[in-house]
Amino acid sequence: MKKTYRVKCEKDFQAIFKDGKSTANRKFVIYHLNRGQDHFRVGISVGKKIGNAVTRNAVKRKIRHVIMALGYQLKSEDFVVIARKGVESLEYQELQQNLHHVLKLAQLLEKGFESEEKH
């Protein structure tokens, strides 16, 4: 993922948490904030409750892959994806469906793409 598509610094994370809206399902929480940029930016947070570093990094890679696959469908907002406990045991397909579901709930998918549940 290119640097321009990442939320990295602490003040950006805090601004999204403070001023943004949140949406959640059983496996993910998403905070999002529209800042008027021309493309989306994403931050991924996987806490220590999920597992050791190897497990957390594997979960982050899967999330990153799903986000980049949906890239052209996502609205131009900053958002933070927080993984909840239990996400580490999901297969890729289940993780993809859960993440797609919470993005749809947060209305972060462009119009016309919401009906594409199954890939």
From Swiss-Prot:
EC primary class:
hydrolase
- InterPro entries xref list: Ribosomal_Su5_D2-typ_SF, Ribsml_uS5_D2-typ_fold_subgr, RNase_P, RNase_P_CS
Q: Which reaction does it catalyse?
A: Endonucleolytic cleavage of RNA, removing 5'-extranucleotides from tRNA precursor
Q: Which Gene3D superfamilies does the record cross-reference, listed alphabetically? A: 3.30.230.10
State the superkingdom. Bacteria
Documented EC number(s): 3.1.26.5
GO biological process terms, alphabetically, are:
tRNA 5'-leader removal
Q: Family membership, please give it.
A: Belongs to the RnpA family.
Q: Describe the task this protein carries out.
A: RNaseP catalyzes the removal of the 5'-leader sequence from pre-tRNA to produce the mature 5'-terminus. It can also cleave other RNA substrates such as 4.5S RNA. The protein component plays an auxiliary but essential role in vivo by binding to the 5'-leader sequence and broadening the substrate specificity of the ribozyme.
| Annotated protein name in UniProt | Ribonuclease P protein component
Write down the species: Streptococcus pyogenes serotype M12 (strain MGAS2096)
